[in-house]
Every structure is written in C-alpha cells, then in structure tokens.
Amino acid sequence: MVHFLVADKDNPGSICSSLHCARENARTLREILPTEAWELLNEFFADCTRNVESAINKRTRFEFLKRIVITLQTIAGMLDGTMNRNDAYTFSMLGRNLERADMTSRIVDVRSAQLLPAETPELRPFESVQWMSVLKSLSGYQMYRLKMRTRVKRTDVLQFLLRDDQFPRSCQFGLMQLERSLTDLPRSEGVLDVLGDAARFIERAPLTTLDQPGLHDLIDKIQLHINNVHDMIAEIYFPSRNVGGARPLLGQARSQGQTQRQSSLSFGEAAKA
C-alpha cells in the first residue's frame, strides 16, 4: 500500500508520479516561473527519485514525507512571494484553492470515518483526542485553538474545517479565494454562479445534527459541488479538454471530476491560458 501511494509510477496519484508531472509542467514554463522555484523543484525531484526507498522503510518514512511537505511549502511560498500578479498567477491560484477545498473535504471524510463511535459512553473521553488528530492532519490544530478558544469538539471542528473564513485550508475559505481569482478573469459569470451554489450549500449544512453516515453523505455532496466548479472552469477556459462537450451534473460520479482536475488545472496548463 505504501509503495502504491508513494512510489508506484503506474499510479497517477502517487507522490512520485505527481512530482514527475509537476516537474514536466514546470520545465515547459521555465521562462514564467521564478528561477529559484524551478531549480528547487528540479533538485527535489532528483532527490526523491534517488531516495524513494526510504519512504518504504518504516524507520525513515516520516523524515522522507516531512521533507516533501517542507519542500513543497517552500516552493508554494516562492511562487506566492515572487510571481507577477498576472493570468499565470491567477490560474495557479484557481488550481491551488480548488484542490485545497477538495482535499480538505476528503481528509475530513476519511479521518472522521476512522474515529471510534462517540455514542459508546466509555469512548466519549477520547472524542476530543480523535478530532484533534483530524485537525493535525490539516495543520489546523493551533489555528483552531486560537480561533475557537475552547476544547476540541466535533461540531466546532467541522465548523472550522468546512466553514471558517480565516483558515486557509477550510473549504469555505478556498471557495472565497476562488471567487476573488475569478473576478479578475473574463467570462466568469457562469462559474461564479456555480461557486455560489457550493458556498451556500456548505453554509446551510446542518453540522450540529449530523451522525457519521450523514456526515459522509454531506461530504459527498460538497465534493460534487466542487467538481461542478472545476467542470465549469474547464469548460470555459480549457475547452479542448471537454471532448464530449457536456458538463457533468451534480449527481454524476465524482471520480471524473477528480481526474480532470489533475489534468486541466495543473499549474503548467493554467499558466499557458
């Protein structure tokens, strides 16, 4: 399983495959990207390729993955701090925030499904510890405590990760940033309408009354709304990707939207738009 997620070149979602695609996209756009960011990405790709086996070894896996996180955050900081605020930057922000909103919803879904049932009285004391681990999965524990100033509770965590308008990795914050980017682009009215539908759905969700199956169903619908936003962006700004011509609707399978998101809103193609 670890090899499949980290090193399998036949898995387009593995870390190594993702790094390879990122490097290829960046290589075609070297005249647009900051030189320091391209050099760091290139060196990092070579380093990961040489040392990928350290991710398979339990003793060295944590350091390998930690280095990936730190390096990618460094590259993101370079792009954010040095790129001109032009169309290339705008489309890169579209891709970043769309992916953030989607991944936050997926992490909440998967991690919450693994939690022990709080309905069992003897397990209730452990509920806050479990939801604390969900926050830490998104590097959100400290920001949650600063914002909520209370102990970790299920409803508050869901409110923070799905609706908060200040935490950069919340779903709602990602949608807000998408709106800001889209207002700088032509022909964005249709996307803004679909984006508004997604934001209203999250804002009106009954978080306080959801059981675990209800939360899973809610996350599914959030992801489908996010897929609709992606599909509309792809339809308007990347029409060559929509071979069939029709935009998938809310009730269709979300896997199609996830696959398209990896291809059509990659940084390299976004910068070419």
Cite the ranges covered by each PLM segment.
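Alpha-helical transmembrane segments and their helix-helix packing motifs
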Residues: 1-273
